[in-house]
């Protein structure tokens, strides 16, 4: 156990999308601090001591209320909510752009699915669990936005990958920043802080052409390592950031400055 943030020990952390690629990194980061982690996801995971799984569709208020009932019945305080769940379309080797992500052909069905998980799900989770925090007059909400919530996608990095970054992802991540600022202002007097991070992409064996191209638009010259955001996330959920709310911290290797 690496206790960089000792005040997070025994704190109760809800992570939506905790079984996703990024969600797993967040889960492990809090677990290593001695926190009690509660994962909300549609994908089942193995439970361990201090890790509890709820099969939850965060786009359904009823599902979220069932989780809240669990906390209330057990008289468990919610210390931190991490809104990490989102749908992301990424280039893969030999990818065939069957879903037609070009704006001219982008389907309403995929648009609604992406916004429902990434934005509506974050709003509903904030509404349900944030209200509980506000009643207790204590809590932290951290939203996961993206560098593409700051700037538009540079479609040139997808050249030769037969892929285009869809409009829905950027809209969701911009919306997350708006949700963050609204929530921070709304519950400030209730001692509920809300911040966001805007990370860049994490290396995960992406398409070779994509990797070659994206390095050209990141001043540091590489994608993030999978655990490189851990300390930033922990900091924003700890007492060390007690005077921060409504902040959006960009951690992108310099991508958004050029």
What name fits each language-model region?
Residues 218-229, 240:
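A conserved structural motif in NAD(P)-dependent oxidoreductases
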Residues 84-99, 254:
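Conserved NAD(P)H cofactor-binding loop of Rossmann-fold oxidoreductase domains
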Residues 87, 99-124, 138, 142, ...:
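Catalytic Tyr-X3-Lys loop
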Residues 108, 113-135, 148-149, 184-185, ...:
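Amphipathic alpha-helical dimer-interface segment in Rossmann-like NAD(P)H-dependent oxidoreductases
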């Amino acid at each position: 156990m690496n206790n960089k943030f000792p005040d997070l020990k025994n704190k109760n952390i809800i992570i939506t999308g905790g079984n996703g690629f990024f969600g797993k990194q967040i889960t492990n980061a809090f677990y290593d601090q001695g926190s009690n982690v509660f994962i909300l996801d549609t994908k089942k995971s193995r439970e361990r001591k201090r890790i509890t799984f709820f099969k939850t569709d965060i786009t359904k208020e009823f599902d979220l209320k069932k989780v809240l009932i669990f906390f209330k019945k057990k008289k468990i305080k919610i210390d931190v909510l991490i809104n990490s769940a989102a749908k992301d379309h990424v280039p893969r080797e030999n990818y065939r752009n069957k879903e037609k992500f070009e704006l001219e052909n982008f389907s309403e069905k995929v648009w609604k699915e992406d916004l429902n998980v990434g934005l509506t799900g974050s709003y509903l989770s904030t509404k349900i669990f944030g209200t509980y925090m506000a009643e207790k007059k204590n809590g932290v909400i951290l939203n996961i936005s993206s560098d593409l919530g700051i700037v538009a996608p540079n479609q040139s990095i997808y050249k030769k990958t037969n892929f285009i970054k869809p409009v829905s992802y950027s809209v969701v991540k911009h919306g997350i920043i708006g949700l963050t600022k609204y929530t921070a202002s709304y519950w400030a007097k209730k001692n509920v802080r809300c911040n966001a991070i805007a990370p860049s992409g994490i290396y995960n064996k992406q398409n070779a052409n994509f990797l070659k191209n994206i390095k050209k638009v990141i001043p540091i010259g590489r994608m993030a390592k999978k655990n490189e955001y851990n300390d930033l996330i922990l900091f924003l959920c700890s007492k060390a950031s007690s005077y921060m709310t409504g902040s959006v911290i960009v951690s992108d290797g310099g991508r958004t400055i050029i």
